[in-house]
Swiss-Prot record:
Belongs to the methylthiotransferase family. MiaB subfamily. Residues 378-441 form the TRAM domain. This is tRNA-2-methylthio-N(6)-dimethylallyladenosine synthase. It comes from Acidithiobacillus ferrooxidans (strain ATCC 23270 / DSM 14882 / CIP 104768 / NCIMB 8455) (Ferrobacillus ferrooxidans (strain ATCC 23270)). Its EC number is 2.8.4.3. Residues 2-119 form the MTTase N-terminal domain. [4Fe-4S] cluster 1 binds at residues 11, 48, 82. It catalyses: N(6)-dimethylallyladenosine(37) in tRNA + (sulfur carrier)-SH + AH2 + 2 S-adenosyl-L-methionine = 2-methylsulfanyl-N(6)-dimethylallyladenosine(37) in tRNA + (sulfur carrier)-H + 5'-deoxyadenosine + L-methionine + A + S-adenosyl-L-homocysteine + 2 H(+).
Length: 451
């Protein structure tokens, strides 16, 4: 048994979890990550249950893998993540060729589950919620060759929005200890990482491992991270408006390396719908926090998530959402049609919105958001932006790509020696999904990627 293949669905936290699965099995079993599932001895599917038909997507993928198992019975197939947590034994009954089923909070038990599967010759299922165990058993991350990295600092959510499965699949809010986070980030920076994105389902609810008053929240953590030599940029996602406190707003003005971009999901511009969603904030409270963010950090860009067609959403409710979009002028937001998710309170709500109406509203909303985003991109043409070069462009391996502070992708000509540097880049063109630029100044050697 030598090769491991992992396919990941969903958010950045799942990407982080997949990295840790690979790290864990590399240490415990010497498994090497490969890009081709045909070569794998162990295939893992890390799943997401946020959107409609998530379960169907999982079983379709497992169907693609089933022939590997039929040709080589010794191949191990595992399913992790939120669909695994949600389905448990039902997943095994529908796909009996699956050997491992594990939840987001038990990925650290993968070595034991794999050993038991091989020794006992029978499937293993573990979808418990031992939050403390997961953070206490994260392996040391091996050397990296990239300029950016994700670091999970918080998991779960206590907000219980009526449309959301997260509390049922990831559990209640739990924060990682600050010393552990600082150690991991220092190690990553020593390996050459220059930008860190802190992750959590409700990341600004971070309160340290004990949750005691005075231990330090997200603002305190950001201040400590900003002192690490060599770290050039910080981000965090995803935030809940109810937990965006005064200290965190002030941090956007005082911490220079904190990116002037915040993803702050609002979901709807109607107070009536926000109440039905159990969002724990009003439109007015949201606007007040946006105003204070922009006062603390002029030029900060705000992106959001929107759900259209939530049960009971009227034309007036949708119009209120469009008014909010115009008022805030969101940048690069995500929007979705409401879909029923298992075990959520919204399943009991009546007054469902017809599918055709959902589609029409989504098209209108996305058109407005895309127009605002393109207008902002066009306004960057002719300006100089600090761009962290992250590697070769996916479209053209002879070019480089990087990110602006406001999270815009920029492609430019240059040398691979620039990877890991923060460059001043003149923006020369705005394309639908990216910017083009020209390097104006190469950063000093001290800012280059360690190799």
């Amino acid at each position: 048994m030598q090769n491991l293949y992992i396919k990941t669905y969903g958010c950045q936290m799942n990407e982080y979890d997949s990295e840790r699965m690979a790290d864990t099995l590399a240490v415990s079993h010497g498994l090497r990550l490969v890009d081709d599932p045909v070569l794998a001895d162990v295939l893992l599917l890390n799943t997401c249950s946020i959107r409609e038909k998530a379960e169907d997507k999982v079983f379709t993928q497992l169907g693609f893998w089933r022939p590997f198992k039929e040709r080589r019975p010794e191949v191990v197939i595992g399913v992790g993540g939120c669909v695994a947590s949600q389905e448990g034994e039902r997943l095994r009954r529908r796909a009996p060729y699956v050997d491992l089923v594990f939840g987001p909070q038990t990925l650290h038990r993968l070595p034991d589950l794999l050993d038991a599967c091989l020794a006992e010759r029978r499937p293993q299922v573990d979808i418990a919620f031992p939050m403390l165990e997961k953070f206490d058993h994260l392996p040391q991350r091996p050397g990296r060759d990239g300029a950016t990295a994700f670091v999970t600092i918080q998991e779960g959510c206590d907000k219980f929005c009526t449309f959301c499965v997260v509390p049922h699949t990831r559990g209640r809010e739990y924060s990682r200890s600050m010393p552990d986070i600082l150690r991991e980030v220092r190690a990553l920076v020593e390996q050459g990482v220059r930008e860190i994105t802190l992750l959590g389902q409700n990341v600004n609810a971070y309160r340290g491992a004990t949750g005691l008053v005075g231990e330090g929240g997200l603002a305190d953590l950001l201040e400590r991270l900003a002192r690490i030599p060599g770290l050039l940029r910080l981000r965090y996602t995803t935030s809940h408006p109810a937990n965006l406190d005064d200290e965190l707003i002030a941090a956007h003005g005082s911490i220079g390396i904190l990116a002037p971009h915040l993803h702050l999901p609002v979901q709807s511009g109607s107070d009536r719908i926000l109440r039905r969603m159990h969002r724990k904030h009003t439109v007015g409270q949201y606007l007040d926090k946006v105003d204070r963010l922009r006062a603390a950090r002029p030029g900060i860009q705000i992106s959001s998530d929107f759900i259209v067609g939530f049960p009971g959403e009227t034309d007036a409710d949708f119009a209120a959402t469009m008014e909010l979009i115009d008022a805030v002028r969101f940048d690069q937001s995500f929007s979705f049609k409401y879909s029923q998710r298992p075990n959520t309170p919204a399943l009991k709500l009546k007054d469902s919105v017809p599918e055709a109406v959902k589609e029409d509203r989504l098209a209108v909303l996305q058109g407005r958001i895309n127009g605002l985003a393109q207008g902002y991109a066009q306004a960057l043409v002719g300006t100089q932006q600090a761009v962290l070069i992250t590697g070769p462009s996916r479209r053209d391996a002879q070019e480089l790509t990087g990110k602006t502070a406001c999270n815009r992708a920029v492609n430019l000509a240059g040398s691979m020696d620039w990877v890991g540097q923060m460059l001043d880049v003149e923006i020369t063109a705005a394309l639908p999904n990216s910017l083009r630029g020209r390097a104006a100044l190469v950063a000093p050697t001290s800012q280059r990627l360690a190799v």
